[in-house]
Amino acid sequence: MTLDPQTPVLVGVGQVNQREESSDTEPVDLMAAAAREAADPRVLQAVDSVRVVNLLSWRYRDPGLLLAGLIGAADARTRYSGIGGNTPQSLLNQACVDIQAGRADAVLLAGAETWRTRMRLRARGIRPDWTKQDESVPVPPGGEEKVPMSGPGEDR
């Protein structure tokens, strides 16, 4: 039996935990480090779609665009999720569907938070000097989705 070439396959997993306080390490740097831990540089360069779970600790217009540049996949399409507890799984599901349909060949899913660093810096009156994307950078698909945090039954 031959495997369909468009069968989604998980190639690697990477996780980076930043234990020390560093005002220099921003969320997109953590995502790039995790990506490098997950896959060989040649695999990362082949990524044609970067999908990022919504970040709460720092605002980027398109974090996937920054991440794609850091891993050498500058031409990758990007997607940014809305806020919600199941968004990582939703991004994975959609990546598999897109690979099966031939809309993507290699998808990188990423996410990162630097909340502890932000709060420690804030307590000292310091604002991180992290990447600020110009407002002219378009928000990628998914980035403006409004995900309700409660259903009609809960709103009563």
Question: Where do the PLM segments sit?
Answer:
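Conserved "HGTGT" condensation-loop signature of ketosynthase/thiolase-family condensing enzymes
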Residues: 1-81, 96-101, 111-156
